[in-house]
């Protein structure tokens, strides 16, 4: 029993142990699985990150056009880092020590600042004196542009008395050692000497001035200097000169002024066309300065506000600036000349200003001046000043395809060209434009220790009297281009001797045919320019002559023609031409001006008799004044000699005027006045004569000189209402409808013009009998009508037709006498008309 119980207990314990072991194994497997999963995740994450970095590194490497594996990317990265390390070490070796150079300045900026502080400039010359490099700071010290010195000899800018000494210093120093070892170049080649250098000027005619300078430098072998140590110097050497310089030595020196300058010119413009804006009062005081000004001039706005602009200008530029400002005040806008402005760093900077005056929007008073200042370089200023002086800037002599040994050939070319130009013009010319081509400078200078800093040129030996001939050619060309040649003969006479003499020039020895042909090409170019300018001037002359001829013709048309009034072909009517009247009354009748109707000459007496008989035909052409025939003149004198009121109509008088009759159409109405005046202007006529005609109510015709023609028209009242219409806006001919006194009310538009005193019945018969020969010119039928059509205000549909008939009825005149009793003023006019009317029974038809 006990055994059975113990066995059962043992079996239960074993079962419990097995289950616990199984559970433990399961737990261990779960833990291992979890660890493995986490490890795989971390490994995958690391691989992904590594791949991303490799990919990014490969994208930064150059030459990654093809896909690279990881090892290639790593290898190229290693190569790049190794090369970068070498370059960094090389740069550190040539880097200026940080203890005395600020970290925020580069080597070039620090070098420029050091040169400005030392009042010096860099100069690199060969042992024979050829200049191969000049820093830009030479302009602020000696007023030379770098292009003036490069490829020139240093002896051209040193007085002649110092040539031998400087040449000895440059040449004998290298004879001490035949081999240029690195140790020698580092330790024993230090060289210092003093001499005088020529100062540049804008005008070459100014006397030369020399500055006492000091050279401090050493010799450098051009092939021993590393590319990183060149610091931009290699780029300044021309490519054609580099092979000859590779095995040679140059002298690199810092040239300093013995006497420092207190104020220098800031001539280097790193960014051209820099500008800033300011506003000034009318007294030229600063009112505003924009944010672009401080980096250029150094002043902040509050430092200049209220100060005058003239406080910052150079004393030599004040006169020109004052003229520019006067021009501004006169015209309201303008552009200034080049002038120097003093910066805060005590340096002169060249500026040019565009300015204009702004006005108040309400009262239009000037408020202030707006200025836009532009920074310009000294090269532009010098070129502009020399152009004003008539001197052209010349380019440097050397070209890219010439070597150093071509200097002698250039001299031969310039000498031969000088001979050609001297044959062309024997008169001497002043010195030329640029000092860059100066080859010699003859000035006697005493010992430097006893001479002042600035040595003026001795007048007995001018330093620039021997000049290259090509400079004279440039100056002559500029003078020729500024001349005005008036004809082709002048241009040909100037240019033909040039070519004829140039072609006859012998070619000097050592001078190639190509070089001589280049000179002839230059002469031909000059000749072509002269001929082209001559043709342009001739064309201008011909055009001006043609314009002058047209103006003269127009003046002759205005002053030479008389008064001519034109009739429209569609509107026939009566038109009076140039009426010539004498001044005052005379007892003897001289001549009567004829009136042309449809090309027929009709004397005035025929018109008068025609008015009495009513035979006046319609006219279709303009009236032209012609010479009176002798037969009509005699008949008119015989007829009108007995008139109590006589009319004088001479054909020509001295100092007379012609009166154009601008039409004024008068249509009578009962309420209107009976007197109408028609003024007309009177232009001049060189061949015809005129006077002033006055028609009065008492039927007297008076003629007196004056500037205005006053025509008095007597209007007869009619039963129907009429309107007085001034037709000056129509600008047509004078239309006169002679009065018809019919019994019908339809003939209401009547215009009566009294031109002469009516004669007695016996005189009427005599007038009719005498005028029979002259009236043969009129071939009209007995019954004619005078009509005129006039467009009112340009409207073709609206026409004003004045029609008047002249029937031979005896009841006409009593009917008109009966109609003149409507008003007191018209009654007086009717009495005058009744006294002057002839007996209708004695009027005979023509």
Curated annotation (Swiss-Prot):
Site Important for interaction with BMAL1: list residues: 84
The record's account of tissue expression is: Hair follicles (at protein level). Expressed in all tissues examined including spleen, thymus, prostate, testis, ovary, small intestine, colon, leukocytes, heart, brain, placenta, lung, liver, skeletal muscle, kidney and pancreas. Highest levels in testis and skeletal muscle. Low levels in thymus, lung and liver. Expressed in all brain regions with highest levels in cerebellum. Highly expressed in the suprachiasmatic nucleus (SCN).
Query: What's the impact of mutating residue 42 to E?
Result: Phosphomimetic mutant with no effect on DNA binding or CLOCK-BMAL1 transcriptional activity
Name recorded for this polypeptide: Circadian locomoter output cycles protein kaput
Q: Please, what other remarks does the record include? A: CLOCK-BMAL1 double mutations within the PAS domains result in synergistic desensitization to high levels of CRY on repression of CLOCK-BMAL1 transcriptional activity of PER1 and disrupt circadian rhythmicity.
The bHLH domain sits at 34-84
Enzyme Commission numbers on file = 2.3.1.48
User: Quaternary arrangement and interactors, per the entry?
Assistant: Component of the circadian clock oscillator which includes the CRY proteins, CLOCK or NPAS2, BMAL1 or BMAL2, CSNK1D and/or CSNK1E, TIMELESS and the PER proteins. Interacts with KMT2A; in a circadian manner. Forms a heterodimer with BMAL1. The CLOCK-BMAL1 heterodimer is required for E-box-dependent transactivation, for CLOCK nuclear translocation and degradation, and for phosphorylation of both CLOCK and BMAL1. Interacts with NR3C1 in a ligand-dependent fashion. Interacts with ESR1 and estrogen stimulates this interaction. Interacts with the complex p35/CDK5. Interacts with RELA/p65.
Composition bias type Low complexity, residue spans? 478-493, 624-637, 644-654, 811-829
* Domain of life of the native organism: Eukaryota
Q: Where found?
A: Nucleus; Cytoplasm; Cytoplasm, Cytosol
Q: Which SUPFAM superfamilies match?
A: HLH, helix-loop-helix DNA-binding domain, PYP-like sensor domain (PAS domain)
Query: Renumbered to this chain, where is the cross-link Glycyl lysine isopeptide (Lys-Gly) (interchain with G-Cter in SUMO1)?
Result: 67, 842
Q: Is this entry keyworded Ubl conjugation?
A: yes
The task this protein performs is described as:
Transcriptional activator which forms a core component of the circadian clock. The circadian clock, an internal time-keeping system, regulates various physiological processes through the generation of approximately 24 hour circadian rhythms in gene expression, which are translated into rhythms in metabolism and behavior. It is derived from the Latin roots 'circa' (about) and 'diem' (day) and acts as an important regulator of a wide array of physiological functions including metabolism, sleep, body temperature, blood pressure, endocrine, immune, cardiovascular, and renal function.
Cite the residue spans of the region called Interaction with SIRT1: 450-570
Q: How is its activity regulated?
A: There is conflicting data about the effect of NAD cofactors on activity. PubMed:11441146 suggests that the redox state of the cell can modulate the transcriptional activity of the CLOCK-BMAL1 heterodimer; NADH and NADPH enhance the DNA-binding activity of the heterodimer. PubMed:23229515 reports that NADH and NADPH have no significant effect on DNA-binding activity of the CLOCK-BMAL1 heterodimer.
Gene name per UniProt: CLOCK
Q: Which residues form the PAS domain?
A: 107-177, 262-332
Q: Which UniProt keywords apply?
A: Activator, Acyltransferase, Biological rhythms, Cytoplasm, DNA damage, DNA-binding, Isopeptide bond, Nucleus, Phosphoprotein, Repeat, Transcription, Transcription regulation, Transferase, Ubl conjugation
- Which Gene Ontology molecular function entries are recorded, alphabetically? chromatin DNA binding; DNA binding; DNA-binding transcription activator activity, RNA polymerase II-specific; DNA-binding transcription factor activity; DNA-binding transcription factor activity, RNA polymerase II-specific; E-box binding; histone acetyltransferase activity; protein dimerization activity
- Motif window: Nuclear localization signal: 32-47
Q: Where is the composition biased (Polar residues)?
A: 447-463
- Give me the ranges of the annotated region Interaction with NR3C1: 371-845
Chain positions covered by the region annotation Disordered: 392-411, 420-495, 624-654, 764-783, 811-846
**Modification(s) after translation:** Ubiquitinated, leading to its proteasomal degradation. O-glycosylated; contains O-GlcNAc. O-glycosylation by OGT prevents protein degradation by inhibiting ubiquitination. It also stabilizes the CLOCK-BMAL1 heterodimer thereby increasing CLOCK-BMAL1-mediated transcriptional activation of PER1/2/3 and CRY1/2.
Q: What's one GO BP annotation on this UniProt entry? A: negative regulation of DNA-templated transcription
């Amino acid at each position: 029993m006990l055994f059975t119980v113990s066995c059962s207990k043992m079996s239960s314990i074993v079962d419990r142990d097995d289950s616990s072991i199984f559970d433990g194994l399961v737990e261990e497997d779960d833990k291992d699985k979890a660890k493995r999963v986490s490890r795989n995740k971390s490994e995958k994450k690391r691989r992904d990150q590594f791949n991303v970095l490799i990919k990014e590194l490969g994208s930064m490497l150059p030459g990654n056009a093809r896909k690279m594996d990881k090892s290639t990317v790593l290898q190229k990265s290693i190569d790049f880092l190794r090369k970068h390390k070498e370059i960094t070490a090389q740069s550190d070796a040539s880097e200026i020590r940080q203890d005395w150079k600020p970290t925020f300045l580069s080597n070039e900026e620090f070098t420029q600042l050091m040169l400005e502080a030392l009042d010096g400039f860099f100069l690199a010359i060969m042992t024979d004196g050829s200049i191969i490099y000049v820093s830009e700071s030479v302009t602020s010290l000696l007023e030379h542009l770098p292009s003036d010195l490069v490829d020139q000899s240093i002896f051209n800018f040193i007085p002649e008395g110092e040539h031998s000494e400087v040449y000895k210093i440059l040449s004998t120093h290298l004879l001490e050692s035949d081999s240029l070892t690195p140790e020698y170049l580092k330790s024993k080649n230090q060289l210092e000497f003093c001499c005088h250098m020529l100062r540049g000027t804008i005008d070459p005619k100014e006397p030369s001035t020399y500055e006492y300078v000091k050279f401090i430098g050493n010799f450098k072998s051009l092939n021993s200097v590393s590319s990183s140590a060149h610091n931009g110097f290699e780029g300044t050497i021309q490519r054609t000169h580099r092979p000859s310089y590779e095995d040679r030595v140059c002298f690199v020196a810092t040239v300093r002024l013995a006497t420092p300058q207190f104020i220098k010119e800031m001539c280097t413009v790193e960014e051209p066309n820099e500008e800033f804006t300011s506003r000034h009062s009318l007294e030229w005081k600063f009112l505003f300065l924009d944010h672009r000004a401080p980096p250029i001039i150094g002043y902040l706005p509050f430092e200049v506000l209220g100060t005058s602009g003239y406080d910052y200008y150079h004393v030599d530029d004040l006169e020109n600036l004052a003229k520019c400002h006067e021009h501004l005040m006169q015209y309201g806008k303008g552009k200034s000349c080049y002038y120097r402005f003093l910066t805060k760093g005590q340096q002169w900077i060249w500026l040019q200003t565009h300015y204009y005056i702004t006005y108040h929007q309400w009262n239009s008073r000037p408020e202030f001046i707006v200025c836009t200042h532009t920074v310009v370089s000294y090269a532009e200023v010098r070129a502009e000043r020399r152009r004003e002086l008539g001197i052209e800037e010349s380019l440097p002599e050397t070209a890219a395809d010439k070597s150093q040994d071509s200097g002698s050939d250039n001299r031969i070319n310039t000498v031969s060209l000088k001979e050609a130009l001297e044959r062309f013009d024997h008169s001497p010319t002043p010195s030329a434009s640029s000092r860059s081509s100066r080859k010699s400078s003859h000035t006697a200078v005493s010992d430097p220790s006893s001479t002042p800093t600035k040595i003026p040129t001795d007048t007995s030996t001018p330093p620039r009297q021997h000049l290259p001939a090509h400079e004279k050619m440039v100056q002559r060309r500029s003078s020729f281009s500024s001349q005005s040649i008036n004809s082709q003969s002048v241009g040909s006479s100037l240019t033909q001797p040039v070519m004829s003499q140039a072609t006859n020039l012998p070619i000097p020895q050592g001078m190639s045919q190509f070089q001589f042909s280049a000179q002839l090409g230059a002469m031909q170019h000059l000749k072509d320019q002269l001929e082209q300018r001559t043709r342009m001037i001739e064309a201008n002359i011909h055009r001006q002559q043609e314009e002058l001829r047209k103006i003269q013709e127009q003046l002759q048309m205005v002053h030479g023609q008389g008064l001519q009034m034109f009739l429209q072909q569609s509107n026939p009517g009566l038109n009076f031409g140039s009426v010539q009247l004498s001044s005052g009354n005379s007892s003897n009748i001289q001549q009567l001006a004829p009136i042309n109707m449809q090309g027929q000459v009709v004397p005035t007496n025929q018109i008068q008799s025609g008015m009495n008989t009513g035979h006046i035909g319609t006219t279709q052409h303009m009236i032209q004044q012609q010479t009176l025939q002798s037969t009509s003149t005699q008949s008119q004198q015989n007829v009108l000699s007995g008139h109590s009121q006589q009319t004088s109509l001479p054909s020509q008088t001295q100092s007379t005027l012609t009166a154009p009759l601008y039409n004024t159409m008068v249509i009578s109405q009962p309420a209107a006045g009976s007197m109408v005046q028609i003024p007309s202007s009177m232009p001049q006529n060189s061949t015809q004569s005129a006077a002033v005609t006055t028609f009065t109510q008492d039927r007297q015709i008076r003629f007196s000189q004056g500037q205005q023609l006053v025509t008095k028209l007597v209007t007869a009242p009619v039963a129907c209402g009429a309107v007085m219409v001034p037709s000056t806006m129509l600008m047509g001919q004078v239309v006169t409808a002679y009065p018809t006194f019919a019994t019908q009310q339809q003939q209401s538009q009547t215009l009566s013009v009294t031109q002469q005193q009516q004669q007695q019945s016996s005189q009427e018969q005599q007038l009719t009998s005498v005028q029979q020969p002259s009236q043969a010119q009129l071939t009209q039928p007995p019954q004619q009508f005078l009509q005129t059509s006039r467009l009112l205000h340009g409207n073709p549909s609206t026409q004003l037709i004045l029609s008047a008939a002249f029937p031979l009825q005896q009841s006409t005149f009593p009917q008109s006498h009966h109609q003149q009793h409507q008003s007191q003023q018209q009654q007086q006019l009717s009495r005058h008309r009744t006294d002057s009317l002839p007996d209708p029974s004695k009027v005979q038809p023509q």
